[in-house]
């Protein structure tokens, strides 16, 4: 039934503004107090929608549920008597009574009114309640009880509570002394008006319009209300009994209240909610039925945890297709700000999901430009994400709860990536799909098993993941997800495992071959190890891997290969580290050999031209009898042929004349045995003191060859 009485102290000082009077046992109550330093200006009521729209409302249309926290008891010393009724309006009062209208909150309101002597009831007096109870008994609907916990409305003439908060005007002149004033209802040809506090309601065929800033005061109408109730009660009951009988019996003991144009106007300090409330204006709210629900258990919980009793409404709203179209006009900046909170709300629903990380572009609403494709949470449909986003935006969530939710989210992500440690085949992305790859899928190569007897072991290391949303040209706009760094734990090396090597110096390479990226030539299977971690002699390894080591030049000191190319297979990185060490060892060996060669040249100066020309020459015959058993020149490795000129050194080694002449011009030694050949110009004393044996031995040899 429509409730025409509310309790509100007209005069409240600064101290009493933070409290309100005791909650009625079964009815709605007027709330005057502070919420985050703001004030609740007034509480108004609206009638419900028509029977046709009520049936649509039961079909599952949008509802807005307003859950009010408990409020503290009011300091009754500062309360004043009831405001007077506006004298300009007619003194007649219309009390509409249908089959669905029963005194649901009458006893509770009367009880709370009697406990507060400073506030007088206007509508729910004993006479009016007796009249309404008698009207209800005539329609055999006395089985409906006043439920203190839940009071839902779904009838033609019932009303809903509107809690209007002045949260955006800190300097607002709506002082805390604004009280609810019950004014007369004017009956003008089927039109009934009533003024409640700062709001005037025009009741015409079950519709309500609210006009603010009207504060009339007229004498009390308790007597007129009783007379008007008796007068119009029977007529209205007869008019509405036939149409509403079915709905009354279906509702049972639970009352549902809704309004044709009822919408909860709620202002918050959040800029996002301000934009949403601006679009959901009264013009667009004609098709949105309201649903008011009071939960005493919820209020009891908040009453025990809140030191200062405030009103914290929580609106749970099911977003319809029309409202989704209205929200498409929001700018991108607001959508980006809400993206993180939307994802966290979606994670709570999809926390236990383990579906494959594929989400289709067709299912994604292009109006929102932020989307997260974490594999275990990627199956969130756009409508579900929108529903959770609306819950997160409109709900008055405490900061402690928000921090706990953030911690739970990041912990879930960390546990997921730590547990997801097995190899998976990379999935192909078809048209209209995005592939949210895992850290292993961003590797340049797949983890193939080696062809050797011993299988590869995955080495621990750091993987820096850069998941990016890839889509075709027809897909909507997307943003790259922020980099997430996943660190692996370093474990001790076991037998047969390759050590993880990193280099701390700049690479210098003379390779001028191809400039392909590292992930294109990464072939871990081409790298073989035997049982002792030794490289097998496979000459095709270096040929197959067309490595351009200049790609790794310029890295900062202390930056290893693993950090530089985090998306490459760790096995390939290990191979590159070993290859680098081998290259360094080879360069060291070559440098040592070059130093040795220089020392030899210094110790053995080149032979003189006269000494070279004085060497004996031998003509090679067909049977090679002149040169003995030698078949080829040791310098050029060419076989001796007939009529070639061979030269014999003092050590009895034969060479081609041109070959040995070039050699002796660089070093005065035999290319085969390194025996000293007499130098070109040398001091006799130095020669006699330093190398007497070397000079004597060739002489003896020549003496022996002469006979």
Curated annotation (Swiss-Prot):
Location of Phosphoserine modifications: 306, 320, 339, 430
Compositional bias (Polar residues): 109-119, 482-491
Q: Where is this region: Mediates interaction with TBC1D31?
A: 549-569
Q: Name one GO molecular function term.
A: zinc ion binding
Acidic residues: which segments have biased composition?
A: 465-481
Compartments where found: Cytoplasm; Cell membrane; Endoplasmic reticulum membrane; Golgi apparatus membrane
What the entry lists under Pfam families is as follows: zf-RING_2
Q: What is this protein called?
A: E3 ubiquitin-protein ligase Praja-2
């Amino acid at each position: 039934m429509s409730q025409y009485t509310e309790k509100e102290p007209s005069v409240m000082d600064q101290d009493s503004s933070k409290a309100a009077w005791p909650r009625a046992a079964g009815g709605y109550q007027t709330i005057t107090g502070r919420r985050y330093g703001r004030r609740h200006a007034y509480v108004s009521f609206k009638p419900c929608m028509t029977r046709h729209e009520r049936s649509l409302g039961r079909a599952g249309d949008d509802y807005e549920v307003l859950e009010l926290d408990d409020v503290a008891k009011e300091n009754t010393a500062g309360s004043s008597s009831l405001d007077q009724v506006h004298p300009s309006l007619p003194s007649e009062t219309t009390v509409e009574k249908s089959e669905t209208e029963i005194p649901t909150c009458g006893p509770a309101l009367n009880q709370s009114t009697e406990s507060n002597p400073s506030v007088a009831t206007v509508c729910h007096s004993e006479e009016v309640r007796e009249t309404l109870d008698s009207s209800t008994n005539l329609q055999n609907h006395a089985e409906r009880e006043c439920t203190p916990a839940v009071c839902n409305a779904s009838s033609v003439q019932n009303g809903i509570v509107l809690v209007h908060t002045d949260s955006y005007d800190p300097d607002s002149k709506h002082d805390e002394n604004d009280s609810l004033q019950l004014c007369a209802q004017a009956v003008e040809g089927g039109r009934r008006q009533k003024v409640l506090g700062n709001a005037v309601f025009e009741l015409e065929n079950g519709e309500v319009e609210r006009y603010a800033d009207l504060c009339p005061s007229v004498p009390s109408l308790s007597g007129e209300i009783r007379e008007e109730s008796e007068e119009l009660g029977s007529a209205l009951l007869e008019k509405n009994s036939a149409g509403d009988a079915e709905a009354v019996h279906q509702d049972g003991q639970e009352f549902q209240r809704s309004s044709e144009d009822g919408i909860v106007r709620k202002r918050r300090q959040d800029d996002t909610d301000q934009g949403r409330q601006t679009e959901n204006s009264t013009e667009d709210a004609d098709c949105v039925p309201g649903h008011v629900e009071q939960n005493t258990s919820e209020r009891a919980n908040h009453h025990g945890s809140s030191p200062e009793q405030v009103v914290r409404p929580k609106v749970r709203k099911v977003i319809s297709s029309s409202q989704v179209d209205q929200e498409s006009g929001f700018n991108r900046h607001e959508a980006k700000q809400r993206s993180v909170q939307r994802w966290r709300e979606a994670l709570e629903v999809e926390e236990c999901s383990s579906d494959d990380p594929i989400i289709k572009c067709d299912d994604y609403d292009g109006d929102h430009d932020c989307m997260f494709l974490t594999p275990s949470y990627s199956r969130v449909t756009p409508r579900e994400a929108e529903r959770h986003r609306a819950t997160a935006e409109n709900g008055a969530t405490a900061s402690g709860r928000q921090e706990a939710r953030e911690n739970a989210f990041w912990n879930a992500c960390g546990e997921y990536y730590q547990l997801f440690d097995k190899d998976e085949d990379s999935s192909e992305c078809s048209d209209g799909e995005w592939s949210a790859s895992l850290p292993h899928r961003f590797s340049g190569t797949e983890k193939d098993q080696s062809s050797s007897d011993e299988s590869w072991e995955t080495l621990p290391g750091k993987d820096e993941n850069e998941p990016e949303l890839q889509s075709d040209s027809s897909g909507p706009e997307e943003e790259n997800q922020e980099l997430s760094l996943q660190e692996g734990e370093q474990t001790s090396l076991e037998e047969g495992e390759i050590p993880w090597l990193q280099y701390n110096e700049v690479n210098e390479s003379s390779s001028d071959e191809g400039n392909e990226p590292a992930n294109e030539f990464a072939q871990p299977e081409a790298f073989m190890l035997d049982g002792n971690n030794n490289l097998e002699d496979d000459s095709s390894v270096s040929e197959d891997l067309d490595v351009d080591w200049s790609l790794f030049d310029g890295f900062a000191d202390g930056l290893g290969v693993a950090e530089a190319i985090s998306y490459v297979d760790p096995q390939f990185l290990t191979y590159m580290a070993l290859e680098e060490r081998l290259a360094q060892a080879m360069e060291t060996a070559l440098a040592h050999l070059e130093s040795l060669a220089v020392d030899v040249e210094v110790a053995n100066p080149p032979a003189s031209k006269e000494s070279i020309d004085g060497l004996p020459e031998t003509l090679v015959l067909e049977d090679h009898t002149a040169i003995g058993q030698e078949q080829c020149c040791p310098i050029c490795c060419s076989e001796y042929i007939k009529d070639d000129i061979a030269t014999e050194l003092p050590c009895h080694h034969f060479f081609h004349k041109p070959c040995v002449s070039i050699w002796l011009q660089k070093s005065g030694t035999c290319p085969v045995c390194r025996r000293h050949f007499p130098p070109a110009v040398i001091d006799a004393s130095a020669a006699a003191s330093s190398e007497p044996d070397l000079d004597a031995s060739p002489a003896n040899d020549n003496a022996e060859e002469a006979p």
